[in-house]
Amino acid sequence: MTTSHPVLGPEGPIRPTAASPDPAPIRAVLFDFSGTLLQIRSYAERIHAVLGEQTADAEVDRLLVGLEAGLADPEVIRAQQGRDVSARAHRHAFTTWYASVPALAPHADALYDQLRTPHHWMPYADTEETLGRLAHEGVAIGVVSDIGWQLPPTFAHHGLDRHVSAWVHSYEHGTEKPDPLLFDLACGKLCAAPQETLMVGDNPYKDGGAAGAGLRSYVLPAGATPGCRRGLDAVLSLVRDSRRESRPSR
């Protein structure tokens, strides 16, 4: 006896499953924001911006070491819990981390405000090209981000907003990825079914978790250098391949 909702054992379904239809063509793509389409400028540049360009490189290096150490600070760790569920929690999480370095504590708010300032962000070298080609091919595009502020001004500053038809900001909904609610909201805004939608990001848990909501997902390696090519051409290949595979054979 087959089932359409299998119970999975360690090696796979316990009972045979009903034949699955071929994967649907991808009609919509959802992107993560930071680390996927754009990246904040380097911490060294940001520190120079708040302390002054005359700050010695050795001093900046010392502060960067302090930020690295701050990630293990118990107070900083506590502040990250639920970071993206509200604007207030988001600011608190980041400013607590910045302030864990005594020399940066007076500048914690200024460093946080850089996050909300469009010119501090850099699109990856292939972001514009990828979004433009997807839009040209009729693919609906959305952005789903764990974040504490509105993203359209940043995209507009870089001329990218015209490609994006849906925005889902975690802080507006009191939850974080991979909550299916966020992916469902984005699919609804794009009038695309989850099985017709691809989620692209750089976090295996948060962005890869879109699979739990019925989407396909593509996860990029984290930690790309600001301004480099991100490898987003693979997204175009996935979309095109899905459409070729869905065409009836002659």
Regions found by a protein language model. Name each.
Residues 7-125:
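N-terminal helical cap/lid subdomain that shapes the substrate entry/recognition surface
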